């Protein structure tokens, strides 16, 4: 027996059962004073919130005659509410002590409570719902049947009642019996008959006969009130079947007691003989309460226990304070009609928990007489022969089963055997695979942790350099170098180990491929059989599940490490910011602050406020170079297992990149330098314009650089952009056809069939290729073409950059003024453009001479600079000259 069981056996176990309300209580609608909180806690007379008559005002002592609620909490070993069944009570009370009873310990179960609280129903029950006594007998004989091959068990039962302080035998018609105390047997009832039933049916019949002889009379409280205390006792004697000179015999006694309920004559209306019965019942229960109080009071040593004050307490002497394991079932009523009885029952039950007893198994060692030796020897010889026969039968049965198994293996389907063999191989492979994978993920986590710690150490050292003195910086530098060297050494060791684990994983993958190819030989058309395919799929799913759980654990560890660093950083910031603000205002008040310091303080304020800053794509970020810490997405990402494809047996080692992590780059626009910053050289122009996307064949692209001022005249090669719907209305139909035919380099020869301007375009392109042969070929014949200067698309001189159609900033008024200023400074570069050798158009900017009404015509002329046919006449639907406008 374990130590826990011994501790429980030394203390009385107390349970409480709350019965449902009867018809009378429901009719009168008495309030409930007992509330079951859970399986162990019970609340008696709890406080209830009452709605006050006055709105928003609580009245105190409104009814001075009203009784205050006790609001008591009781804790017991088990609490059963109104919905509990007889089987539940038996499972938690008597059934656990049956094992102790079979081991030779005395056990007692008794029901205690007021009249009408449900004690008799709990112990005896009815035909539809049998009680604890009936269920105990069934389970006891069931246990005896299980051990009958090892031990000889004999049972004896007795049934008595204590009526008006007299003991009567319920199984026979006898007079009052006397109580004696024996030094060896303990308390003994002289003249009590013992019956030896052979089965559970016989013992239940005896129990039924005894209940019929029990004294019961109706009262005003209970129609079937028990007027006596009933004690049902079972004696069990166990002896080993093995013949021996020294026999060990176990003798135990179990007592199942149904006590009569305490009552008050004013409530029960008892008169005459009923009044005498009630007086004796209360006397015996009072003596029982005094015994419980004396046993529960462990502070006083050598205290007198008043067992002799009643016949009932004398019978329960062994059960309460002797060598016995006792369980008390306290039955209570939830109604306020039995308020005092319920309170007294709970009070005595709570005290009974403190009663302790010393348990001892009743094992007797019987030495046989010398005259019995011959008989014992014969019994042992017979037992030896019986055991030999059993052993022989067992060996024959085992040999027969082995032959049957061999026959099954011989006659079984070869495919089934192969399937079982492959299943075992898959189990072994995936067990190794799971271990290797777990080791790999662990190494990956340790490497990430080392990288994170290294970055934290470097960051901490930078902060120390900015804050501390030189002596402390030197010490911190030595400490940092030592830690970084240690982390580096550890990381190198982990990397080597990681490579070894990766090789092991590759070997396991090769073996898995070989097994899959062998499994394909079993199936039809080179497919794996369905059973093996399901088995393989289950193994993969199980491996993925284990891997995800491991990754979650590793992510939690890394997150904890990062959270610790964040807390330290937050503590530093919380300490520095108030000091910085205080120093700033001190300098401000004394006038020692300058503009640079104010600007720095404003920048810090912006950082603290977390304001968002809009920046162009080509502008450099000051904090971009300070990203020493690894990203959270990269930190929390572990290498995933890719689906394994089956390969032939002769294939070499599988892809070693299975375990490698594929970096996920953040999508961003390709930054192109601003064309205004390009130097006027052929090489630089070609290097910046090689293999750009074709703007004719694709949609409009957003601007990829920040427009900037141009202070010097530079030779520009504006990119060909797809004209929008607004510019298409200004361009003529011939120029649109020419632009559409430039979409593919292979179709440039077809341009000769169209307008004359297209031949000029092709010639200019060929001239450009001959002039710069080092230009790289086109990336794609359909998706992109080289962006060439706009001068090759016209026979006139090229326009300056300010005269071109702006791509983004042209829609703002400020940009228009900017380009007008640039046009005056770029006219000087027009003459230098004529020396390039290409046919160009030149339109002079006369915006300063002409009136503002002609700006509309001038803009239309600017957008038609991409015309390729110089002989075509410009046609306008409306003449916008000065005379027509007026």
Curated annotation (Swiss-Prot):
Keywords, ordered alphabetically: ATP-binding, Cell projection, Coiled coil, Cytoplasm, Cytoskeleton, Glycoprotein, Isopeptide bond, Microtubule, Motor protein, Nucleotide-binding, Nucleus, Phosphoprotein, Protein transport, Transport, Ubl conjugation
GO MF annotations in UniProt: actin binding; ATP binding; microtubule binding; microtubule plus-end binding; plus-end-directed microtubule motor activity; tubulin-dependent ATPase activity
The encoding gene: Kif18a
Post-translational modification remark: Glycosylated.
Gene Ontology CC annotations of this record: caveola; centrosome; cytoplasm; kinetochore; kinetochore microtubule; mitotic spindle midzone; nucleus; ruffle
Region Disordered: start-end pairs: 774-804, 862-886
Kinesin motor domain boundaries: 11-355
Location within or outside the cell: Cell projection, Ruffle; Cytoplasm; Nucleus; Cytoplasm, Cytoskeleton, Microtubule organizing center, Centrosome
Record keyword Ubl conjugation present: yes
Protein name (record): Kinesin-like protein KIF18A
């Amino acid at each position: 027996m374990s130590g826990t069981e011994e501790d429980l056996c030394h203390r009385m176990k107390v349970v409480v059962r709350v019965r449902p309300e009867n018809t009378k209580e429901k009719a009168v609608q008495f309030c409930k004073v007992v509330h079951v909180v859970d399986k162990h806690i019970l609340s008696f007379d709890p406080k209830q919130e009452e709605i006050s008559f006055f709105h928003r005002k609580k009245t105190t002592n409104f009814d001075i005659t009203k009784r205050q609620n006790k609001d008591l909490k009781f804790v017991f070993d088990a609490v059963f509410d109104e919905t509990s069944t007889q089987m539940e009570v038996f499972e938690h009370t008597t059934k656990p002590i049956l094992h102790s009873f079979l081991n030779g310990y005395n056990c007692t179960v008794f029901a205690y409570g007021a009249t009408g609280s449900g004690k008799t129903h709990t112990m005896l029950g009815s035909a539809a719902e049998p009680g604890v006594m009936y269920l105990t007998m069934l389970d006891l004989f069931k246990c005896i049947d299980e051990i009958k091959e090892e031990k000889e068990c004999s049972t004896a039962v007795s049934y008595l009642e204590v009526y008006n302080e007299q003991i009567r035998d319920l199984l026979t018609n006898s007079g009052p019996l006397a109580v004696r105390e024996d030094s060896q047997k303990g308390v003994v009832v002289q003249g009590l008959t013992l019956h030896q039933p052979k089965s559970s049916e016989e013992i239940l019949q005896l129990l039924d006969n005894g209940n019929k002889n029990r004294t019961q009379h109706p009262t005003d409280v209970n129609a079937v009130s028990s007027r006596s205390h009933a004690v049902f006792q079972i004696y069990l004697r166990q002896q080993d079947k093995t013949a021996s000179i020294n026999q060990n015999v176990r003798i135990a006694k179990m007592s199942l007691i149904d006590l009569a309920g305490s009552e008050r004559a004013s409530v029960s209306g008892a008169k005459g003989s009923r009044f005498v019965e009630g007086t004796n019942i209360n006397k015996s229960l009072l003596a029982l309460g005094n015994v419980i109080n004396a046993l529960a009071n462990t502070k006083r040593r050598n205290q007198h226990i008043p067992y002799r004050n009643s016949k009932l307490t004398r019978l329960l002497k062994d059960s309460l304070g002797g060598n016995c394991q006792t369980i008390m079932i306290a039955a209570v009523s939830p109604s306020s009609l039995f308020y005092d009885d319920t309170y007294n029952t709970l009070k005595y039950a709570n005290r009974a928990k403190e009663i302790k007893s010393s348990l001892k198994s009743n094992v007797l060692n019987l030495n046989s007489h010398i005259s019995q030796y011959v008989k014992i020897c014969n019994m042992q010889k017979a037992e030896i022969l019986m055991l030999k026969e059993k052993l022989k039968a067992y060996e024959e049965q085992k040999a027969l089963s082995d032959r049957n198994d061999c026959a099954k293996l011989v006659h079984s389907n070869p495919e089934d055997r192969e399937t079982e063999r492959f299943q075992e191989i898959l189990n072994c492979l995936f067990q190794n695979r799971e271990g290797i994978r777990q080791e790999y993920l662990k190494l990956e986590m340790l490497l990430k942790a080392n990288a994170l710690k290294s970055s934290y150490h470097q960051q901490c050292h930078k902060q120390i350099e900015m804050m501390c003195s030189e002596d402390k910086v030197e010490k911190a530098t030595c400490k940092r170098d030592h830690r970084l060297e240690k982390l580096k050494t550890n990381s190198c060791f982990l990397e080597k180990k990681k490579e070894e684990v990766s090789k092991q994983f590759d070997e396991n993958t090769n073996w898995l491929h070989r097994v899959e190819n062998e499994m394909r030989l079993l199936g039809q058309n080179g497919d794996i059989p369905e059973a093996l395919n399901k088995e393989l799929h289950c193994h993969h799913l199980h491996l993925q599940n284990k891997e995800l759980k491991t990754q979650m654990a590793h992510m939690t560890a890394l997150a904890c490490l990062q959270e610790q660093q964040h807390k330290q950083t937050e503590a530093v910031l919380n300490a520095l910011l108030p000091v910085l603000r205080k120093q700033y205002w001190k300098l401000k008040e004394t006038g020692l602050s300058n503009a640079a310091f104010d600007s720095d303080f404003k920048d810090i304020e912006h950082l603290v406020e977390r304001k968002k800053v809009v920046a162009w794509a080509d502008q450099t970020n000051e904090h971009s170079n300070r990203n020493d810490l690894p990203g959270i997405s990269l930190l929390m990402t572990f290498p995933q297992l890719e689906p394994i494809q089956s390969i032939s047996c002769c294939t070499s080692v599988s892809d070693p990149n299975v375990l490698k992590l594929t970096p996920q780059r953040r999508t961003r626009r390709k930054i192109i330098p601003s064309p205004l910053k390009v130097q006027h050289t052929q090489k630089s122009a070609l290097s910046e314009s090689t293999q750009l996307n074709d703007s004719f064949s694709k949609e409009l692209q957003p601007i990829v650089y920040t427009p900037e001022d141009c202070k010097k005249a530079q030779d520009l090669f504006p990119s060909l952009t797809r004209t929008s719907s607004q510019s298409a209305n200004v361009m003529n139909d011939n120029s649109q056809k020419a632009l559409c035919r430039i979409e593919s380099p292979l179709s440039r020869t077809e341009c000769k069939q169209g307008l004359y301007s297209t031949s000029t375009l092709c010639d200019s392109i060929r001239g450009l290729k001959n002039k710069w042969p080092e230009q790289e070929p086109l990336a794609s014949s359909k998706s992109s073409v080289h962006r060439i200067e706009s001068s090759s698309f016209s026979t006139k001189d090229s326009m300056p950059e300010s005269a071109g159609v702006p791509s983004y900033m042209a829609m703002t008024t400020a940009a228009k003024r900017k380009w007008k200023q640039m046009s005056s400074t770029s006219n000087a570069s027009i003459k230098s453009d004529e020396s390039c050798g290409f046919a160009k158009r030149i339109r002079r900017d006369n915006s300063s001479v002409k009136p503002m009404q002609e700006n509309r015509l001038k803009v239309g002329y600017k957008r038609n600079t991409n015309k390729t046919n110089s002989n075509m006449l410009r046609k306008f639907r409306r003449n916008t000259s000065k005379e027509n406008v007026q």
